[in-house]
From Swiss-Prot:
Belongs to the TRAFAC class translation factor GTPase superfamily. Classic translation factor GTPase family. IF-2 subfamily. Keywords: Autocatalytic cleavage, Endonuclease, GTP-binding, Hydrolase, Initiation factor, Intron homing, Nuclease, Nucleotide-binding, Protein biosynthesis, Protein splicing. It comes from the Archaea. GO terms for biological process: intein-mediated protein splicing; intron homing. The gene is infB. One of its GO terms (cellular component) is cytoplasm. Function in general translation initiation by promoting the binding of the formylmethionine-tRNA to ribosomes. Seems to function along with eIF-2. Residues 173-265 form the DOD-type homing endonuclease domain. GTP binds at D524, T525, P526, G527, H528, N578, K579, I580, D581. It holds the Pfam family IF-2. This is Probable translation initiation factor IF-2. It comes from Pyrococcus horikoshii (strain ATCC 700860 / DSM 12428 / JCM 9974 / NBRC 100139 / OT-3). PROSITE patterns: G_TR_2 (PS51722), INTEIN_C_TER (PS50818), INTEIN_ENDONUCLEASE (PS50819), INTEIN_N_TER (PS50817). This protein undergoes a protein self splicing that involves a post-translational excision of the intervening region (intein) followed by peptide ligation. GO terms for molecular function: endonuclease activity; GTP binding; GTPase activity; translation initiation factor activity.
């Protein structure tokens, strides 16, 4: 069948250096449920496994759960896979929130504000920044008791509390001690109280470990601790309607504020006091903590009754967005919420009012259908039309872009309770506090950061964020709605060509270029480890790659890894030479094309850039590539184009986008032509479970069109899965009305190139990195199954031969790792996709018994199951895991080398080396005839050591060398040509041995095998001669020695 062809947008992957300039000072703290509060420096030093290291930075594997803001707006515990240490010299900013903590960050580190994510150097006093309302702790009694027993081991001999009630009493007591700042006079105290006091001192190591213990202890124990503290130090301020702690040291107040977050209570910190106010906080205080003293408890009830409101939420734009999404005008809401309009402009609504607003909005507008007909022009209603004009939906009698968009949203009912629930989650989990001041200072030293799945974490009780390389391109969509807008796909970001033209319009005109591509599709999972997963028909899914190199650091290990991968997959690429803004004296003009920006620079800065570019060009030449600055390239098929950029400031992004578009169009046009209506082909990026949908696959479609209800064939664990598409989901476009954070659009079809989530039965066993093929007919299904099984069988290995066990996260990365191992002639017993299991360890153990060198497991981008860890540790099976293929293999090869050296050292320690000696014929060199015999000898061949047995020419044993002496010095060894005296235990001169006689070191068969098979490289010529001489002697009695 013949289908219409058109050019699709090219698929672009980003590899190489990850721009990681967003860091914090070493002393900034994160709070981990398993460890309590810990500075970033301590967190880094606590981890041992280095993933990457150079002169400027070090990345270590972390694998510890920590509080983050989840995509649904809730504070969650998610694993932070990596922690960074980066060398930094330059400006730092300390952001201090009003009546709260501060945090010191590099200028580009973003904070979540009511205006979205804002960089530290763009914050100003008065901006509102997100602070978590709750910090989850451990809340696991068994783990806490384990921690207590471990801590007290050998330190204190008292009976520990045995029940919850006793522990709660102890924590209450500890809180009172903390409230008195540990100033308790033990005189006159009972034995029981003294014991509790001793337990307090050891467990809490006052004041150092208080916060840690309180984040590891069950929350009810924490509540009792706080009650004890507030009973001693707490007051009810009836005038200000708040609970206060007065006169405590500021450090204690800061610790206390973080402890209160475990219960969802946000306090205010003043120089010498702490206050809890607002109805929500006071009610939580009463529920969890309260006062034991009746008068204070009564006063607390009084201020709660008089407190009408809780925290305020100045989320004016977000309120307008969700109101319009659900079809309300301001006037409509004002009938239910008095004076509603002020909450979108000047007065931040309190928690209580905001909840009332959201409850009203969630019910939807009764007049929505009427509003649709008005926007469609079918009905005229003067009042609504005037409202729509004020809202910016109608201008000059026509619908604006916003009006058109809302009409589509209302018609399709693209909103439901989940939109409201996201905002509820934000309000329940965060408060927004104003920036009080921002201090700037110079810093020279190490800074730290943590990588998390959601690109954010909580430091010093403040939410901070780190970004990806695509952020700068995405940001260009702000105020570019009329240009079509950058849209988010599953696993990809689409940049329409209109946006490229908007960013790079002047350049396109200057170069007289015509771009016919519909856009660019950037894969959202940058890095070489993701690239290896992007397979399509045996090659790379990516049509083109951007290799990002820090122009100041030059080639790094990940650069070399990326080049090798690009070469292996024959993927064309361009080079982005990043961080030109770090060149001394570089003049920055944000979002400016490089060719315009360079005209602002002085000669010295230009020369420095030229030098750095020539260094890069030289390195590329070493790897077999001709390279040049992009505007100097004569032939793009023969020369690599290097675009100097600053991802941080947007300099050179215009040229990069135009170059990608131009090269794709000129050289990849035939590849980009797809059959629009042809059956779809794609690659699975990820398999994940979605609430309400079951197991789904995130897929990049690179050919054809996929429809709902299509039959698809998908690569599975050990089979091809045939299933039917139940739903196709794409994220909502990134615009001001829809909320794309966790919402999907259900669509009937998707055309390449696109990222899509597929919901279908039976996807539990689907393999990341494997193909997805649409199959319209039964014959197509069979062909697709055969094709997919061929691909899987070519990568997944299962044999009985001696070899390593290989595990990877996707089919593509498994293939890449296996190829590298095969090229290095490292045999593979088993290669499969998935985490490392106990079965893998047992398989490696069976190999280890045959050949220890190969009894190992290599894992790329995978985790090790707990039971597998335990068995591997017990059976001493080495497991190597990492996310850089060559580094993984390097680590394994280094281990082999170390093991061989260790084995060699062990063999050297126990093996007997060959040696032949001759007693001097002169009787003067017989120093003692027996017990032991001491004689002068010369080593004729080989070597001798104390402890070796000597034999005669006829094979008869004559005794053992007890010691070797040269003049006044005892030796551990004597070699060929040395004249020494030796003491021989068991020999009598004149009976067993005689002056002038030749004696041989007695070797066993095992000695000979070890020497010739395992230690051949350490044997010298004289050792070989000695071995042959000994073999001749021993061959008379044992035929084995004839072969030596």
């Amino acid at each position: 069948m013949s289908y219409v062809k058109r050019i699709r947008q090219p698929i672009i992957a980003v590899l190489g250096h990850v721009d990681h300039g967003k860091c914090l000072l070493p002393e900034e703290r994160v709070i981990l449920p398993d460890y309590g509060p810990i500075t970033l420096e301590e967190l880094f030093n606590m981890t041992k496994e280095t993933v990457f290291k150079d002169e400027e930075k070090e990345v270590r594997k972390l694998g510890i759960r920590m509080p983050v803001a989840g995509v649904d707006g809730r504070v969650r515990l998610l694993e932070g896979p990596y922690v960074w240490k980066v060398r930094y010299k330059g400006k730092m900013l300390r952001v201090k929130l009003k009546d709260w903590h501060s945090v010191a960050v590099t200028p580009e580190h973003p904070f979540l504000t009511t205006r979205g994510w804002v960089r530290a150097d763009q914050l100003k006093p008065g901006d509102y920044v997100a602070v978590p309302k709750i910090l989850p702790g451990k809340d696991d009694k068994e783990k806490f008791l384990q921690y207590v027993h471990e801590k007290l081991k050998g330190k204190v001999h008292i009976k520990l509390p045995s029940s919850d009630e006793e522990w709660e009493t102890f924590f209450y007591f500890a809180g009172t001690i903390f409230g008195r700042e540990n100033s308790v006079n033990p005189e006159g105290l009972t034995h029981e109280v003294k014991a509790l006091l001793e337990l307090f001192k050891v467990l809490f190591e006052y004041p150092r470990e208080v916060l840690r213990v309180l984040f590891m202890a069950p929350v009810r124990y924490v509540a009792n601790f706080l009650r004890g503290f507030f009973d001693i130090n707490g007051y009810v301020n009836g005038e200000e309607l708040r609970v206060e702690v007065r006169g405590a040291p500021h450090e204690v107040l800061e610790e206390l504020s973080l402890i209160l977050l475990r219960l969802g209570i946000v306090s205010k910190i003043y120089p010498t006091s702490l206050a809890i106010s607002g109805r929500r906080n006071l009610e939580l205080f009463r529920r969890y903590i309260g006062f034991s003293e009746k008068q204070k408890a009564k006063e607390l009830e009084g201020i709660i009754r008089r407190s009408e409101n809780s925290e305020s939420y100045p989320i004016f734009e977000e309120l307008r967005r969700i109101r319009l999404l659900f079809g309300f005008t301001r006037a409509e809401l004002s009938s239910t919420i008095p004076l509603y309009s002020k909450y979108e402009s000047k007065e931040a609504p309190s928690y209580e009012i905001l909840m009332k607003i959201l409850n009203t909005i969630e019910k939807g507008s009764k007049d929505l259908n009427k509003k649709i007909t008005i926007l469609e022009g079918r009905v005229r209603d003067h009042e609504y039309i005037e409202e729509f004009k004020r809202e910016g939906l109608i201008k000059d009698g026509k619908l604006t872009e916003l009006g058109k968009e809302l009409l589509e949203v209302w018609r399709n009912r693209e909103f439901d309770s989940r939109d409201v629930n996201y905002l509820r989650n934000i309000i329940e989990n965060f408060v927004f506090l104003p920036v009080e001041k921002i201090e700037e200072f110079e810093y020279d030293g190490y800074v730290y950061d943590v990588t998390t799945e959601t690109h954010n974490f909580i430091a010093n009780g403040i939410l901070v964020h780190n970004t990806t390389l695509l952020d700068k391109i995405r940001k260009t969509n702000v105020a570019a709605k009329e240009a079509g807008g950058i849209t988010q796909h599953i696993g990809a970001t689409e940049v329409p060509i209109d946006v490229v033209k908007k960013i790079a319009g002047p350049l396109i005109k200057l170069w007289k270029a015509e771009i016919r591509l519909p856009g660019l599709l950037f894969i959202d999972t940058p890095g070489h480890e993701a690239f290896t997963s992007l397979r399509a028909r045996g090659g790379s899914l990516a049509d083109l790659a951007v290799l990002v190199i820090d122009v100041n650091e030059g080639f790094q290990p990940q650069t070399i890894e990326s080049i090798e991968i690009l070469r292996r997959y024959r993927t064309p690429f361009v080079v982005a030479a990043n961080k030109i803004d770090r060149i001394r004296g570089w003049v920055i003009e944000e979002d400016e094309p490089f060719l315009m920006n360079i005209k602002r620079q002085d000669q010295r800065a230009i020369q420095e850039l030229e030098t750095k570019l020539w260094e890069l060009i030289g390195k590329f030449y070493e790897f077999g590539f001709q390279a040049n600055r992009f505007d100097r390239v004569q032939n793009f098929t023969r020369e690599l184009a290097i675009v100097p950029i600053s991802a941080k400031y947007g300099i050179g992004i215009a040229e990069l986008l135009v170059l990608i578009a131009g090269l794709s169009q000129k050289y990849l046009e035939e590849k980009l032509k797809i059959e629009v209506e042809g059956p779809a082909r794609g690659t699975i990026l990820e398999v994940r479970e979605e609430p309400g949908l079951g197991h789904t696959i995130d897929v990049i479609i690179y050919d054809g069109t996929l429809h709902k209800d299509d039959t698809i064939v998908v690569g599975g664990k050990d089979k091809a899965i045939v299933t039917k598409v139940r739903a196709l989901l794409k994220p909502k476009p990134l615009d001001e009305i829809r909320d794309p954070r966790f919402r999907f659009d259900y669509v009937d079809e998707v055309t390449a190139a696109a990222g899509v989530k597929i919901a279908a039965p039976g996807l539990e066993e689907a393999l990341a990195g494997s193909p997805v093929i649409a199959a319209p007919t039964p014959e197509d299904v069979e062909r697709a199954k055969e094709e997919i099984m061929r691909q899987i069988e070519s990568v997944v290995i299962s044999t009985d031969k001696v070899g390593v066990i290989v595990k990877a996260d996707t089919l593509g990365s498994l293939e890449a790792l296996s190829k590298e191992l095969q090229e290095k002639e490292i045999p593979i017993r088993k290669a499969d996709v998935g985490n490392i299991s106990k079965t893998d360890v047992m398989e490696a153990l069976s190999v280890k018994e045959e050949n220890p060198k190969y009894g190992v497991i290599l894992g790329f981008n995978v985790k090790v199951n707990e039971d597998a860890k335990e068995v591997a540790k017990a059976k001493e099976v080495p497991i190597f895991v990492g996310n850089i293929i060559y580094k993984l293999i390097e680590d394994y090869e280094a281990w082999i080398k170390e093991e061989e050296e260790k084995r060699k050292r062990e063999l050297l320690a126990k093996v007997t080396f060959p040696g032949v000696i001759k007693l001097y014929p002169d009787e003067r060199y017989v120093f003692r005839r027996s017990n032991p015999a001491i004689v002068g000898i010369e080593v004729l061949e080989g070597r001798i050591k104390p402890g070796v047995t000597l034999i005669k020419q006829n094979g008869q044993k004559v005794g053992t060398i007890r010691s070797i002496k040269s003049r006044d010095e005892f030796l551990q060894e004597a070699r060929k040509g040395q004249a020494v005296a030796i003491a021989i235990e068991g020999a009598i001169v004149g009976r067993h041995i005689h002056p002038g006689e030749t004696l041989y070191v007695d070797l066993s068969r095992d000695d000979a095998i070890i020497l010739l098979k395992h230690l051949r490289d350490v044997l010298e010529d004289t050792d070989i001669k000695a071995l042959k001489m000994i073999a001749q002697v021993k061959a008379k009695e044992d035929p084995f020695w004839r072969a030596v």
